[in-house]
């Protein structure tokens, strides 16, 4: 594996003239400290990073282009809202860098990366990825078994990307810092001016947290699952991202 090198943080000025710093992922494999940021920060940081999956057909590398943050016990959209600790959510209470995989609608798996430290149940849902090479795309097609002419259909949604990468409940609980089957590496962060924020998808039960701008994606990337016409640039939304209700 590639040794990680800390790249520090990028200084950005928002629309009000306020300066903020976005931590950047390392060169090489993610470290424990990288995963231990809060979910909102990690969700932003993960954009442009490389998700690596070892499959029976070989290694597949993909670029993360869309994420959602789930911010723990106070977040009514989070599985661990109000400290809910069940057999299903137990993985969220593990250390940052643990894979949290769950099954929805009786047919799809979703891959999340646990954020923060042990017993601070936050996570980042990976909503969309893009294959890095033609070989990566070919392996994804093998597992998705689709003939769509639109390459983005392979992995422009959380269920689709799990099928394309052969991710299921057996991956739940994997420590992505040490695993040889599933891990993340720092890629090329797109920059604050290319990232937009929007409300998370399909969480009507989250009440006032439904409108939180905790979905992040690379603007105009063809692999993004849903482009929101009301999306707000990261540089305009930064101060609101961390406001408590």
PLM feature segments, named:
Residues 2-245:
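Conserved, well-structured core segments that form or line functional sites
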């Amino acid at each position: 594996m590639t040794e990680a090198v800390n790249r520090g943080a990028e200084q950005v000025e928002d629309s009000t003239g306020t300066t903020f710093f976005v931590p950047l992922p390392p060169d090489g494999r993610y470290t424990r400290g990288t995963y231990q940021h809060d979910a909102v920060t990690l969700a932003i940081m993960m954009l442009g990073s490389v998700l690596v999956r070892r499959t029976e057909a070989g290694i597949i590398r993909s670029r993360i282009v869309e994420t959602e943050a789930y911010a723990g016990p106070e977040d009514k959209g989070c599985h661990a809202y109000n400290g809910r600790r069940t057999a299903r959510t137990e993985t969220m209470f593990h250390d940052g860098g643990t894979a949290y995989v769950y099954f929805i609608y009786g047919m799809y798996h979703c891959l999340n990366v646990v954020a923060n430290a042990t017993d601070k149940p936050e996570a980042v849902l990976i909503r969309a990825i893009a294959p890095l090479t033609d070989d990566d795309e070919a392996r994804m097609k093998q597992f998705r078994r689709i003939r769509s002419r639109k390459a983005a259909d392979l992995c422009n949604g959380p269920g689709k990307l799990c099928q394309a990468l052969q991710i299921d409940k057996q991956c739940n609980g994997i420590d992505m810092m040490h695993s040889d089957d599933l891990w993340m590496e720092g890629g090329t962060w797109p920059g604050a001016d290319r990232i937009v924020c929007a409300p998370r998808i399909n969480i009507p039960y989250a009440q006032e947290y439904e409108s939180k701008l905790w979905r992040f994606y690379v603007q105009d990337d063809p692999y993004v699952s849903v482009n929101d016409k009301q999306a707000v640039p990261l540089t305009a939304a930064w101060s609101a991202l961390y406001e408590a209700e």
